[in-house]
Regions:
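C-terminal effector-binding regulatory domain of bacterial HTH transcription factors
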Residues: 45, 97, 160, 217-225, ...
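Helix-turn-helix DNA-binding motif, specifically the short coil turn and the N-cap/start of the second
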Residues: 5-10, 14
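A short LG(V/I)-centered, amphipathic sequence patch enriched
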Residues: 19-36
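Short helix-loop hinge/linker segments at domain boundaries
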Residues: 31-34, 41, 52-73
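Conserved amphipathic alpha-helical core elements
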Residues: 18-19, 226
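Central regulatory/effector-binding core of bacterial HTH transcription factors
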Residues: 70-128
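Acidic, Gly/Pro-rich loop/turn segments at junctions of secondary structure
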Residues: 103-196
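Hydrophobic hinge/microswitch elements
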Residues: 187-228, 250
């Protein structure tokens, strides 16, 4: 009743009417409130699925409007923000009827429910059957430390010496990033003494001398004082993918943005 903003008596009348029409009890009444019967639980599952389908339909309808206008929802890892934000800003300037929603983080937004128009994802190629997946680029990663760390602890003498150093890692042990998985395989857990949930925080922690950690080529250019502790490995490379839902992929707005993004990204060194 509170969520619907109606009196609880109104909700009770609707429940009674629904039970009468279906000819079955949906709830057990007791002093503490209502408990769903087996039939009530079945109805809830169907209602939830129906609500999800309407949400999905609404998202697709919003995304299928003609022209480059309305919302453009783009999701990405936060580590791409420094290079992606200027592209989004310029695209918005060239399309003044557009509102950009740039959603960053590790969450996988559900494109099939219209939660985003374009997703940039890292790791293995997404395999959802209703998504259109295109290779974007591969991000080269570097294992580095700040001068303050090197002064205190020195530089690792090869892979075997990594166990004698302190590292910055991800707080999510299930991270799909290849360089984070590599670190978990090569370095004992007790040597990863600074954990983060945000890739930008990884850079800040490295610069602060909290330990050895991974940064991108772009970050290396921004912080030339950082020192590579070993040559970059191919297995650290993070492949990135452009992902769109099949129902929105051919819309004018999505196609215009994808074309614009690919042109701008051809000059990136990340």
């Amino acid at each position: 009743a509170e969520i619907l903003r109606v009196h609880h008596a109104t909700v009770i009348r609707h429940i009674d009417a629904l039970e009468q029409r279906l000819g079955v009890k949906l709830f057990q009444r007791h002093a503490r409130g209502y408990t769903a019967t087996e039939a009530g639980q079945d109805l809830m599952q169907v209602a939830t699925a129906t609500d999800d389908q309407f949400t999905q339909l609404a998202g697709r309808i919003r995304g299928q409007s003609d022209g480059v206008s309305g919302d453009l929802v783009v999701t990405s890892l936060v580590m791409l923000s420094p290079v992606l934000t200027p592209v989004l800003a310029q695209f918005r300037r060239e399309n003044p009827d557009l509102t950009v929603r740039f959603l960053t983080g590790a969450r996988l937004f559900r494109l099939e429910y219209g939660e985003a128009h374009v997703a940039i994802r890292a790791g293995e190629a997404p395999s959802q059957p209703d998504n259109v997946v295109q290779p974007f680029f591969s991000q080269t990663m570097h294992l580095v430390a700040a001068p303050s760390y090197i002064e205190q602890h020195g530089t690792p003498d090869g892979i075997d010496d990594l166990v004698n150093h302190w590292f910055i890692g991800h707080d999510n042990i299930d991270s799909r990033a290849p360089f984070i998985r590599w670190l978990a395989e090569k370095v004992p857990e007790n040597r990863i003494v600074f954990r983060i949930t945000d890739d930008r925080a990884m850079v800040d922690a490295v610069v602060s001398g909290a330990g050895i950690g991974f940064v991108s080529t772009w970050d290396m250019r921004q912080h030339p004082e950082l020192i590579e502790v070993m040559p970059s490995q191919k297995e650290w490379t993070a492949p990135l993918w452009l992902v769109t839902h099949v129902d929105l992929h051919r819309t004018t707005k999505v196609q215009a943005f994808l074309k614009f993004l690919k042109e701008k990204a051809s000059d990136w060194e990340v």
